[in-house]
Design a protein with these regions (language model features):
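Internal alpha-helical scaffold of NAD(P)-dependent oxidoreductase catalytic cores
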Residues: 1-68
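NAD(P)-dependent Rossmann-like dehydrogenase/reductase catalytic/cofactor-binding core
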Residues: 52-131
């Protein structure tokens, strides 16, 4: 474990499910999101060779930015810019393509918009940005 930089610490019994869910978000969902991106690129006509090169480059950049800036400041894209019109357009396109992907996009966009509020205000506001 120390080779990963792991450290021992105590997690209260009542928090273990949340702790493990955090690990799922940090590791298990990354391949799911990567696969989804590849699927969308393929459907939109991006050649496989290009998407296979694009994906690791984007993931590496995201991880680098998280390490350097922290997760909140590393956020990019339409939610970070509060480009609600583009978010709606992408959402509508995804709803025509695949409902589970559209639902994931909607849920993750809400989390991203909450992060924007944290970045701008230093705390989550009671009135989130509407999508």
């Amino acid at each position: 474990l120390s080779s990963w930089g792991a450290q021992c610490f105590e997690v209260k019994a009542e928090n273990k499910l949340l702790y493990h869910a955090a690990a799922v978000f940090a590791t298990n969902f990354v391949p799911v999101l990567a696969h989804t991106a590849l699927q969308l690129w393929q459907t939109s006509g991006v050649p496989t060779e290009i998407s296979q090169n694009l994906l690791p480059a984007l993931l590496d950049n995201a991880v680098h930015n998280i390490k350097q800036l922290g997760s909140v400041k590393a956020l990019t894209g339409p939610a970070a810019r509060k480009d609600i019109a583009l978010i709606h357009q992408q959402q509508n396109s995804l709803e025509k393509f695949d409902q589970p992907i559209a639902q994931a996009y909607s849920a993750l966009t809400q989390l991203a918009l909450a992060m924007v509020e944290l970045k701008n205000k230093g705390k989550r506001t009671k009135k989130p940005i509407k999508t």
